[in-house]
A protein has these predicted regions:
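Structural recognition of the beta-strand scaffold that forms the well-ordered cores
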Residues: 93-95, 173, 418-419, 428-430, ...
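Single conserved hydrophobic/aromatic residue that forms the stacking wall/gate
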Residues: 737, 742-747
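Extended, non-catalytic substrate-recognition/exosite surfaces adjacent to catalytic cores, especially
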Residues: 182-467, 471-487, 493-494, 506, ...
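Residue-level preference for non-acidic, small/hydrophobic
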Residues: 23, 52, 96, 134, ...
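Peptidoglycan glycan-strand catalytic modules in the bacterial/periplasmic cell-wall system
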Residues: 12-15, 19-217, 222-270, 282, ...
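Aromatic-capped interface at the extracytoplasmic side
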Residues: 1-12
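Active-site-adjacent helix/loop patches that line small-molecule binding or acyl-intermediate pockets
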Residues: 91-92, 100-102, 107, 111, ...
Length: 747
């Protein structure tokens, strides 16, 4: 018998809900058997209440926990007359007491002993709670299968609606499951469930809740479901929800728990633990009883900055373009022995990469833990078996070896995309890859890749901060610098326009010209460039301050790049990504609110100059494809492509949105062999464009295609113009001198 305290405060486990900024439920966090979301009595449809009472306990309003008439009838018909369809004698309150306090019985005798205890509990529940509260508790507690625990989750899972919107026939279907959810599972047994639904409708007619005509018309209807599988790998914003889960449940970093190669992560986690109130929120905050919040059982409400419409547009853009791009990639690699890897690798190198992937797989770890030898594991990986695999035409069944499946998945190109408001920091869309179910590594905030020419705006910003202007002229010729090892470094240049002529700095950035970039690097300090990149919010400590840094060999995440670019349309103020605005408890009490983090990283003057140059990238330079694909808005941007087309980037912004996209293979040696499809303007830019066309076309979002950047009246970016023509050969930079002036960076 449970103590009085437990009866007065039954222990419910409620799932945490994640909401979009526009009020849509993105998903839940729960244990597999406790995906329950609380709903109050006033938010229940009268149809579900009427169906439940008519079917399970028609005298619910009259008894005090035990229905003597129903109990006597059941005993006589079943115990004496041996009738199988005698009807149940348990009231709704008794059934609730069983759900709350009776474990599953192993045999008939054990179940018989449980019954009297349930009667006593039922009477006490009636004493402590109103009838409405008992009905609410019952419907919140019941397990409707398919990971749909509680009426709110069930209504969404089976009919795609809220409990208050359940139609009569839908409510009857769910109540019909209460007799035996497995037997009357509408997903598996549609006709059987329909028959049970019709029994419930007949009971509702007998109880006077519906007329005979209503019953007949409703019974004639087919059982139609709008089935929504409740799975954290399915639905909208899957990568974002998983990222957010990790942030909310993070523990205080302990260096002993990080391996040597994880020191960068330890560094970032330590910074976040001290400075980010959302990081480890469940660990840092406690409830009234002193215990820490549990993301999976405390029924929290997480209100995020994502807009469900913009998120859908972003996911659609990634899907549409990757599907098309993948066809070109398959065609290029068809017949190549080392595919999907580049021909530049030896077969031994390819085998080593695939072998490493095998050793990192779950199958390998499980077999190794079970004591299998390397030979046994190798044999298992080379044995064909039936499996379902991803394809852009939908999941397909096939037969292949696990080793072949590893190589098969390596063929698929990956992507990362993020979009945010440069003024508020609100992240509006977040896509970490092509399909979370199959490709779970997050390339939006977690993964880092070389950024190529998208780093150039940072160098040009450093130049503006040091007295350059967009109109300064430089001779367009090859420049040679001396690197940190004392060796000459001359960057290659794809741009063959105006060779030998005087060109402006603005022209250099618009055309992503490596020679003009090298010239600026020769006049500046690679250590200062590294420092500026960190100031823009990039936290990778492994950035090497070499002269080649100006071409983007360093690895940065999409999220870091998007945040960094907010400074350009935002008058020099960088805004950190904001993912959550507030957290509430199950009763709607606000537990925490979150505000954007802002930092002035460059002067307003430099921001204006960069804005002018980045607009030229789109209107006059390498980003011109944006215009041809239909985006007419006032905007700036930058393309990026790394060596051998391993990474394709596009960063773009309007006055109200900054968005960035990366596309590439899982491994750097998986890439297009030609620039036709391998450059950033072909791999990443179309995703950005598809997204923006959809966003600007949806007037309900409030983004105006005619919005323009606000520059001072009569602004002239060339007013500080001076002629800085220099030599075509730059003498060695004194690295000893530079290191002496480098200071430790504190983020």
């Amino acid at each position: 018998m449970p103590p009085v305290e437990d009866l007065e405060n039954p222990n419910y486990k409620f799932a945490t809900e994640v909401f979009s900024e526009d009020g849509k439920v993105l998903g839940t966090y729960s244990y597999s058997k406790e995906n329950r979301v609380f709903v109050g009595y006033n938010d229940l449809s009268p149809n579900i209440i009427n169906a439940l009472i008519a079917t399970e306990d028609v005298r619910f309003a009259e008894h005090s926990g035990i229905d003597a008439y129903a109990l006597t009838r059941a005993v006589v018909k079943r115990g004496i007359l041996m009738q199988k369809n005698a009807g149940g004698g348990s009231t709704i309150t008794q059934q609730l007491s069983k759900q709350l306090y009776s474990p599953s019985a192993d045999n008939v005798m054990e179940r018989l002993f449980q019954k009297p205890i349930e009667w006593v509990i039922a009477v006490k529940l009636e004493r402590y709670y109103t009838k409405e509260e008992i009905l609410t508790m019952y419907l919140n507690k019941f397990d409707f299968l398919n990971n749909a625990v509680g009426i709110k989750t069930a209504a969404f899972t089976y009919f795609g609606c809220e409990p208050k919107d359940l139609k009569i026939e839908e409510a009857a279907t769910l109540v019909g499951m209460c007799k035996n959810p497995s037997l009357y599972n509408p997903v598996r047994y549609n006709e059987r469930s329909r028959g049970r639904r019709n029994v419930v409708l007949d009971q509702m007619r007998k109880a006077g809740y519906i007329t005979e005509a209503e019953r007949d018309s409703l019974q004639a209807l087919p059982l139609k479901l709008k089935y929504n599988r409740v799975d954290h790998k399915e639905g909208l914003a899957t990568y974002f929800r998983e990222y957010l889960r990790g942030v909310l449940t993070a523990k205080k970093p302990d260096k002993a728990n990080y391996r040597g190669w994880q020191m960068q992560k330890y560094y970032e986690d330590s910074l976040d633990w001290e400075n980010n109130p959302l990081f480890g929120w469940c660990e840092k905050n406690t409830k009234k009883d002193g215990t820490k919040y549990n993301l999976y059982t405390d029924g929290l409400k997480i209100y995020t900055t994502l807009d469900s419409r913009m998120q859908q547009y972003a996911e659609d853009a990634v899907t549409e373009h990757l599907k098309e791009l993948q066809g070109y990639f398959f065609k290029e690699k068809k017949g190549a022995k080392k595919a999907p890897y580049t021909f530049r690798l030896t077969q031994e190198q390819v085998d080593e990469i695939l072998g490493r992937a095998m050793r990192l797989s779950d199958r390998y770890r499980i077999m190794k833990k079970a004591g299998a030898t390397e030979a046994e594991i190798k044999k298992a990986f080379d044995t064909p078996e039936e499996m379902s695999v991803f394809s852009w035409e939908g999941e397909k069944d096939t037969i292949m070896t696990p080793m072949d499946s590893i190589r098969y998945y390596k063929f698929f190109l990956r992507a990362g995309f993020m979009s945010m408001d440069p003024r508020s920091g609100h992240v509006k869309a977040y896509v970490g890859g092509p399909n979370y179910h199959y490709f779970q590594y997050d390339m939006a905030m977690v993964g880092r890749r070389q950024v190529g020419s998208t780093i150039k705006p940072f160098l040009y910003t450093l130049a503006m901060e040091n007295g350059f202007s967009p109109c300064d002229e430089v001779r367009h010729v090859e420049y040679t610098l001396i690197d940190e090892n004392g060796k000459p470094w001359t960057p290659r240049n794809a741009n063959k326009k105006l060779i030998g002529d005087m060109v402006t700095v603005k022209w250099g950035l618009a055309n992503s010209d490596n020679w003009i970039t090298a010239y600026l690097m020769s006049k500046l300090n690679p250590y200062n460039l590294k420092r500026l990149i960190h100031t823009f919010g990039v936290r990778n400590r492994d950035i090497v301050p070499s002269v080649s840094l100006c071409l983007g060999p360093c690895e940065i995440s999409v999220g870091e790049m998007v945040s960094a670019y907010t400074a350009f349309p935002n008058k020099g103020i960088r805004v950190a990504p904001l993912f959550v605005t507030r957290i509430e408890d199950n009763d709607g009490n606000v537990l925490a609110t979150f505000a954007p983090e802002m930092q002035e990283v460059i002067s307003v003057s430099s921001a204006y100059k960069m804005l002018v140059m980045l607009r030229a990238v789109v209107n006059e330079g390498t980003g011109g494809r944006v215009r041809r694909l239909g985006v007419k808005a006032d905007m700036g941007g930058k393309t990026g492509t790394t060596n051998y087309n391993a990474d394709g980037w596009f960063m773009g912004f309007t006055p109200s949105l900054v968005s960035g996209c990366w596309v590439g293979g899982e491994d750097r040696d998986i890439h297009f062999d030609t620039m036709l499809h391998g450059q950033g303007a072909s791999m990443a830019l179309p995703i950005w464009t598809k997204y923006m066309v959809k966003v600007l076309g949806d007037k309900s979002l409030g983004y105006d295609e005619n919005e323009t950047f606000q520059l001072p009246e009569g602004y002239d970016p060339c007013k500080d113009d001076v002629n800085l023509e220099g030599d075509t050969h730059i003498e060695a930079v004194s690295y000893t001198h530079l290191r002496a002036h480098e200071t430790e960076l504190h983020l």
